[in-house]
Amino acid sequence: MRYISTRDPQAASASFCDILLAGLAPDGGLYLPETYPQLSAEQLNRWQDVLTQHGYAALAAEVLSLFIDDIPREDLEGICTRAYRTPVFSDPEIVPVTCVSTEENLWLAHLSNGPTAAFKDMAMQLLGELFEYELGRRGDWLTIVGATSGDTGSAAEYALRGRLGLSVVMLTPAGRMTPFQRAQMFSLLDDNIVNVAVDGVFDDCQDLVKAVNIDANFKQQWHIGAVNSINWARLLAQVVYYIASWLRIRLQTGKADLRLNVVVPSGNFGNICAAHIARQMGLPLESLVVATNENNVLEEFFRTGVYRVRSSEDTLATSSPSMDISKASNFERFIFDLLGRDSARTRDLFNQVATQGYFDLSQTEEFAKLQQNFGFYAASSTHEDRLAQIRRTWEESHYLLDPHTADGVQVARQLRGKLDGPVAVMETALPVKFEETIVEAVGFVPPVPPRFADIEGHEQRVVELPRDVDALKELIRSKVKPER
C-alpha cells in the first residue's frame, strides 16, 4: 500500500510509516492511499465474527492491515490491543451503540469512552502507540506541533504524555474553550507537554501549525510531526469505528443487508472524511450527513457548491465550540476524490482558497452528481436547536447529549424525511465537558465521571503567545528537548 499527495501527481509515493511521521506532504497536500481497498460481503461477515468473539482491538488490526504493510501483523495486533483496552476506555466494547428512538430508528454510536471523554481519543490512543513503536524502531524523536479547538489537544496530550522520544506543543485559541477543556489540558504538567494559548481563534492556531510545517529546514531540524486530522493515521483509526458501528447495528437489528445513514457533527471534515473513506471501500453507508453549527462553511458548500472560508472575525463563538471552525483542513481529501483524483485541479482550487478565500464548483458536473455519487447531505443547527435536542432526548430517552452531538441529532431529525432506514449519530463527547450549556438546557449539572473529579481545581500551566510564527518557532527552540 502506497500513499500519494492530493496536489502533486509527480511526487514519489510513500509508505505508511513514512507519512505517519510526516503529516503534510512536502507540496502542502494531504496524503491518501493510491487506491481504497474494497470490502466484500464475505469479509464483512467474517469481521462480524471477529468483533463479536475477539473485540474491537482485533477488528482494528484487521482493518488497519489493509492499509499498513510496513508493520508486521503481529506487531500491529499488539499496537491495537494496547490502544483499545480497559481501563483506558471505560466500556469493554470500546464503541457501543444505543437506539435512542425506536420510532425514529435513531441510534447513537458512543465514541466518548476514552480518557478525555471525547471521540478524538479513538484515534489518538492508536496514534500514541504507533508513534512510540515507529520512533523506537528508528531510534528517532518527534516534536508534535498541533492546534485544537477543544478536544483534539487533550486527547493528544493524554495519548502522548510521558512517551519516549515525543514532545507535544499544543496551540489553543485563548478564551475559546470551556473551563473543563482548559483544565484537562493545562493541568498536565509532564515535561514533554507544552500548552500554548494563542491570541486568536482556532484557525489562527491551525495557520501557525501549517506555517511551521511549510518551513522545510525548521521542520527537519526539529522533527516536526502532526496529530491534527491532517495525519492520515488518525483518519484510518476513525474508519474502524464506522465499520464497527455498522456491524453492531446490523447485529442488533438483524438486518443482514443493512444500509446505514450516518450523521456526523462536523468542523474540520476529519470525522466524516473517515465515513467517506469507509463508504468508498464498500461499507454499506447510504447517506453521509454533515451537521454543522452556526459556522456553516461546510453546509454552505454542500448546499451551493461554493466553499468560502471565514475570517477570524467572522467565526462565531458558539455553545458547540469544537465545531467553531471556518476552514476545514481535511476537506481537500474529499475534493480530490470528488474531482476524480485530479491533483492539478485540487492544487489550483486550494491555492485559490489561499489567495481569494473561496472556490466555486456550483456549475461543475462533479457537484451536480455529488449526492448521487458520494451520498452527502448537510444541514446546520443553532444554539436553540442544541438546547431543544438536549432537553428532548433527556426527557424521552433519559440520555444526556453534549452540545455537538445535539447538533447531530438536530440535523438527523431535520433531514429524517430524506434518509431511508436507520440513522446513526456519531457521538462526539460526554456532557461533563459543557456544563454551562447542559444546565441551560435541562436545569442541572451533568454528572462528573469519577476520573474527572476536581479537575478544575488542579494546578495549571500554559504559555501565552501572539499570532506570530517566529514567536512559535522560538518557543519550540526553548522548550523542546531533542532526544530519544
Regions from the PLM with identified roles:
Residues 1-484:
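PLP-dependent amino-acid enzyme catalytic core
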